[in-house]
Amino acid sequence: MVLNLPQELLEEILCRVPATSLKQLRLTCKEWNRLFNDRTFSRKHFDKAPKQFLITVLEERCRLSSLSINLHSGFPSEEFTGELSPIDYHSNSSQVIIMKIFHCDGLFVCTILKDTRIVVWNPCTGQKKWIQTGENLDENGQDFVLGYYQDNKSSDKSYKILSYKGYNYGDQEFKIYDIKSNTWRNLDVTPIPGNYFTCSDYRVSLKGNTYWFAYDLKDEQLGLISFDYTTERFERLWLPFQCDISDHDYSLSVVGEEKLSVVLQLKDAPRREIWITNKMDDETKEMSWRKLFEVEVGTRYYMWSGRPFLVDEEKKIVVCCEKCQKKCQPVITVSMVEADSNATRVYFPVVTMTSYWPHFVDYVPSLIQIQQSEANEKELNS
């Protein structure tokens, strides 16, 4: 009976069904399966699908464990949602070690330790694409971030990967990989003079662009640097007030797909401030900040400098996490702190990689497809 609905109405209804549920419906109807594979529908679904908090943690076995945080049931609660991995552990890839992950638009790019490949992966559909980098990816600081540019007429998104080794005010080499054309090329771009990433692992994606904390040596101030995948240029952005790197703790996150968020605290100050941007101007790149709320500082609030966090703007709740020991067992401690500083704590038992911290993403399971080449289909992908 549902199939007798007008196509436009049917698509509008299905766009509001979580991707994880749609995935289970693929085999029930050929028409729906074709629809779910349609790029236009996938994009429409991603834009309208309900968002959810998802924590991903690199485990000792190099899989990603996930924990869903529900802030909309009156009282914050958590649910273990299982293990995820782009690697088939029953294959000859069992020695593959995921070193870093970066999330953009429902997709992950995973850096593989001591390998020459990275992998772009959709956890919801299981689709993945292995990409040769031409370099052995050891722990020398090589990083890969994913972004996109959007066609103004068709609204189609084309994905790119930026490759770099840190970022500083000296000589630097950047490369870009276009997923559509399956090609690497050197990027002729000049870093912002006198600026360097305070930590290249503190990076987030918003509206297809990538953002990092950066320190200006001349002004001696902490700020942000963004990379625009349309112009392929870096931009300097400012924080809500002047911050010296030696005097402040700081963390960076996103609120939905619309705003940036930072936690700032003058060292030894009694309260931490949570700031978010107003909607940024896509043309001028200008943005303004407003303080959402403050929370008291205490040892029971796990919000140290650079640690991942998420913010619910409507409920004024900040969610943050930390590794710790509980009864001699490694656990992830998730704290949900409200504007009145009331805190709820969740313990997430998981065997983590020794040197890795939990990785927070404001994640929407999506049906977005990763463009493949004929050669890539034959890549050692098992």
Swiss-Prot record:
CDD domains: F-box_AtFBW1-like. Coiled coil: none annotated. Gene3D superfamilies: 1.20.1280.50. SMART domains: FBOX (SM00256). PROSITE patterns: FBOX. Residues 1-49 form the F-box domain. InterPro entries: F-box-assoc_dom_typ1, F-box-assoc_interact_dom, F-box-like_dom_sf, F-box_dom, Gal_Oxase/kelch_b-propeller, SCF_F-box_component. PANTHER family: BNACNNG10540D PROTEIN (PTHR31672), F-BOX PROTEIN CPR30-LIKE (PTHR31672:SF13). This is Putative F-box protein At3g49980. It comes from Arabidopsis thaliana.
